[in-house]
Curated annotation (Swiss-Prot):
GO biological processes: chloride transmembrane transport; gamma-aminobutyric acid signaling pathway; inhibitory synapse assembly
Start and end residues of each stretch annotated as Disordered: 402-434
Catalytic activity, as annotated: chloride(in) = chloride(out)
Top-level taxon of origin: Eukaryota
Record's bilayer topology term: Multi-pass membrane protein
Protein name (Swiss-Prot/TrEMBL): Gamma-aminobutyric acid receptor subunit beta-3
């Protein structure tokens, strides 16, 4: 019962309000009252001086701003800028434009903006901007009964964005939009973000081919110049570059070309045409990739991350070509010449030895020795012990001054020969063991097959290590 009575009371009190609203709406749309609206607008504009700001001589005008971002069209590393399309709204109160008798907001033609005072807002880091003009100039003026003015524009601006490309393309960039008053100082005008952190909308709708918007920040501050302090609002975007495009377009081709250059290690070393053609092709391909990349980036003095990677791949490809040059030199150049010289020297030594040994015994059966041989025998341990005993051997001189040694007895000769042979065998065994150890530690660089075998292991290992260090450093 009480609920039914309460509903009747609410209906009784709400009915006049609804009637008043409907009557006001009808009165505005009534052709007879359109003249009243026209007279109101004419009255507002009559005597209005756009040269003076609202509350001239009084407190500064507070201008609130909203931005609805339509799109970020382009981020250019070459020009160091980005292009932004947005709906830019400014709010302020002008008591000269307050009106009564019409309980509605008045949305006027965009040409009325030329007859009203508007803030002298400009974009500090702007390079090129324009207000869209299809089909009419995209700007709006809306008046509120209390004198609040909404001034909206659809703007496309290209703003400067100074980028640090040292970690390109694994980088993050910070691009800002600086909004400032050109002529009015903080004594005349103040800027603020209308709605606080919600003053900028549409960021979540933005999709960029190469970037992702990590976050955005709103900043309000005053900056001081020689002519005074000016209000400034900043909208800052933190952009993280998407690596997927560069992996497919740059990194993967470079890796595959580097691996392709290693195929020459499995090609026979005497196939010069195949190995040289493969090496030169891979080097030229890496050069083409480097050239194309430099055309898409500005001419900056420091080295970028992608430059380091491409330079590393180029070095590996170039070293693979040099490896075959070294193999070719060993096989066709230095190696055969050295072997020929060694063979000639060995044959000459054998001939000299056989001829010399035939002339070392005189007619009496004595073995002729040179002074150098006697010195060597005296210096050795075996000869020293035998020289101390005068009964073992006798050294004499003939009339020509040539020293000779008489042959010892058969038993002494056999004993001395066996001891010499044992000592020489032990020395040879020791030298052979040392040489085998050195061969295990150091590969024979005169063997072209060994060079190719080692290259098959060393090149992939070092390239994998290079990739590990590169990605750990730049990703983290």
């Amino acid at each position: 019962m009480w609920g039914f009575g309460g509903g009747r009371i609410f209906g009784i009190f709400s009915a006049p309000v609804l009637v008043a609203v409907v009557c006001c709406a009808q009165s505005v749309n009534d052709p007879g009252n359109m003249s009243f609206v026209k007279e109101t607008v004419d009255k507002l504009l009559k005597g209005y001086d756009i040269r003076l700001r609202p509350d001239f001589g009084g407190p500064p005008v507070c201008v609130g701003m909203n931005i609805d971002i339509a799109s970020i069209d382009m981020v250019s590393e070459v020009n160091m800028d980005y292009t932004l399309t947005m709906y830019f709204q400014q709010y302020w109160r002008d008591k000269r434009l307050a009106y009564a008798g019409i309980p509605l907001n008045l949305t006027l033609d965009n040409r009325v903006a030329d007859q009203l005072w508007v803030p002298d807002t400009y974009f500090l880091n702007d390079k090129k901007s324009f207000v869209h003009g299809v089909t009419v100039k995209n700007r709006m003026i809306r008046l509120h009964p209390d004198g609040t003015v909404l001034y909206g524009l659809r703007i496309t601006t290209t703003a400067a964005c100074m980028m640090d490309l040292r970690r390109y393309p694994l980088d993050e960039q910070n691009c800002t939009l600086e909004i400032e008053s050109y002529g009015y100082t903080t004594d005349d005008i103040e800027f603020y973000w209308r709605g606080g952190d919600n003053a900028v909308t549409g960021v979540e709708r933005i999709e960029l081919p190469q970037f992702s918007i990590v976050e955005y920040r709103l900043v309000s501050k005053n900056v001081v110049f020689a002519t005074g302090a000016y209000p400034r609002l900043s909208l800052s975007f933190r952009l993280k570059r998407n690596i997927g495009y560069f992996i497919l377009q740059t990194y993967m081709p470079s890796i595959l070309i580097t691996i392709l250059s290693w195929v020459s290690f499995w090609i026979n070393y005497d196939a010069s045409a195949a190995r040289v053609a493969l090496g030169i092709t891979t080097v030229l391909t890496m050069t083409t990739i480097n050239t194309h990349l430099r055309e898409t980036l500005p001419k900056i003095p420091y080295v970028k991350a992608i430059d380091m990677y491409l330079m590393g791949c180029f070095v590996f490809v170039f070293l693979a070509l040099l490896e075959y040059a070294f193999v070719n030199y060993i096989f066709f150049g230095k190696g055969p010449q050295r072997q020929k010289k060694l063979a000639e020297k060995s044959a000459k030594a054998n001939n000299d030895r056989s001829r010399f040994e035939g002339s070392r015994v005189d007619t009496h059966g004595n073995i002729l020795l040179t002074s150098l041989e006697i010195h060597n025998e005296v210096a050795s341990n075996e000869v020293t012990t035998s020289v101390t005993d005068a009964r073992n051997s006798t050294i004499s001189f003939d009339n020509s001054g040539i020293q000779y040694r008489k042959q010892s007895s058969h038993r002494e000769s056999l004993g001395r020969r066996s001891s010499d042979r044992t000592g020489s065998h032990s020395k040879r065994g020791h030298l052979r063991r040392r040489s085998s150890q050195l061969k295990i530690k150091i590969p024979d660089l005169t063997d072209v097959n060994a060079i190719d075998r080692w290259s098959r292991m060393v090149f992939p290992f070092t390239f994998s290590l290079f990739n590990l260090i590169y990605w750990l450093y730049y990703v983290n």
